[in-house]
UniProtKB/Swiss-Prot annotation:
Its EC number is 1.3.5.2. Substrate binds at residues 66, 111-115, 172, 177, 246-247. Its cofactor is FMN. One of its GO terms (cellular component) is plasma membrane. Pathway: Pyrimidine metabolism; UMP biosynthesis via de novo pathway; orotate from (S)-dihydroorotate (quinone route): step 1/1. GO terms for molecular function: dihydroorotate dehydrogenase (quinone) activity. The keyword Flavoprotein applies. Catalyzes the conversion of dihydroorotate to orotate with quinone as electron acceptor. The gene is pyrD. It comes from Klebsiella pneumoniae (strain 342). This is Dihydroorotate dehydrogenase (quinone). Monomer. The keyword Cytoplasm does not apply. It is an enzyme of class 1 (oxidoreductase).
Length: 336
């Protein structure tokens, strides 16, 4: 009930400042008795996916808690899973500010953050302190100054460090805000990356005596023939899941709106139909051979159900959470 008032205050601020203020407060309560202030009871809706049991099918998408600073406070709100990151081997500042823009009328966001984060070592220390009893995903990427042809090395470094602490690992090769990153979704570059990741996963399984599934996060801007090739590569390399989708470069639904021409990835409601269509095509191509985590514009129970009807086993929210707040979590988990 209170969130519309909180949102009104936060939306008076620059989007990144609003995020900082929110996280300052969440950091104060996380891991303390004050967590009760953000806790909400949601029904159990267990789902098995990638060999893991999720308390419910709703997760927080990567990008909100990049450094894993507020895992427990976010978990208290009722998420079945939380995906932290994207994290890179070394800390990096990301792109110049301003780098995130609200399209309020469209309930969308455009961001060009550029993987700003404190580095994988810092994230691991934060994860060690967390007590979240859901599934923790860790989303990994490459540093901006790492040449794309050496990008695989960055993913393997991050995998090595997060493996003991992750419920699953997400491979982000689809952000539009790191130059050249999306080229890793195609042909030989994708095969080489997936081969290296699978070998590292099996090596780490032996080392730690546990299997941590790996999911690859893809873009919504792939052509149908490109999507078929991606699906084929994921199956051939025995990848455990696919996260569909990241943000889009397509501005067709927001033409004429304030900030619509800002560089970056568009998320929120304008992405809803596009991401659902990708899930539908991907599901038809995969035919149950690996699960899909659906994300992109989910802002209601109906939007979540549409993703599942299209073929997703789990769903995630981000922009919808910014616009609708914690009540959206309870609403989706209760009625999905």
């Amino acid at each position: 009930m209170y969130y519309p008032f909180v949102r009104k205050a936060l939306f008076q601020l620059d989007p990144e400042r609003a995020h900082e203020v929110t996280f300052q407060q969440l950091r104060r309560v996380t891991g303390t008795p004050l967590e009760m202030l953000v806790r909400q009871k949601v029904p159990a809706r267990p789902v098995t996916c990638m060999g893991l049991t999720f308390k419910n099918p709703l997760g927080l998408a990567a990008g909100l808690d990049k450094n894993g600073e507020c895992i427990d406070a976010l978990g208290a709100m009722g998420f079945g899973s939380i995906e932290i990151g994207t994290v890179t081997p070394r800390p990096q500042p990301g792109n110049d500010k301003p780098r995130i823009f609200r399209l309020v009328d469209a309930e969308g966001l455009i961001n060009r953050m550029g993987f700003n984060n404190h580095g994988v070592d810092n994230l691991v220390e934060n994860v060690k302190k967390a007590h979240f009893d859901g599934v923790l995903g860790i989303n990994i990427g490459k540093n901006k100054d790492t040449p794309v042809e050496h990008g695989k090395d960055d993913y393997l470094i991050c995998m090595e460090k997060v493996y003991p602490y992750a419920g699953y690992i997400a491979i982000n090769i689809s952000s539009p805000n790191t130059p050249g990153l999306r080229t890793l979704q195609y042909g030989e570059a994708l095969d080489d990356l997936l081969s290296g990741i699978k070998n590292k996963q099996l090596e780490l399984q032996q080392k730690h005596q546990k299997y941590v599934p790996v999911a690859v996060k893809i873009a919504p801007d792939l052509l149908p023939e490109e999507l078929i090739q991606v699906a084929d590569s994921l199956v051939r390399h025995n990848i455990d899941g696919v996260i569909a989708t990241n943000t889009t470069l397509d501005r067709s639904l927001v033409q004429g709106m304030k900030h619509c021409d800002e560089t970056g990835g568009l998320s929120g409601r304008p992405l809803q139909l596009k991401s659902t269509e990708i899930i539908r095509m991907l599901s038809a191509e995969l035919n149950g051979r690996l699960p899909i985590i659906g994300v992109g514009g989910i802002d209601s129970v109906i939007a979540a159900r549409e993703k599942i009807a299209a073929g997703a086993s789990l769903v995630q929210i981000y922009s919808g959470f910014i616009f609708k707040g914690p009540p959206l979590i309870k609403e989706i988990v209760t009625h999905i």
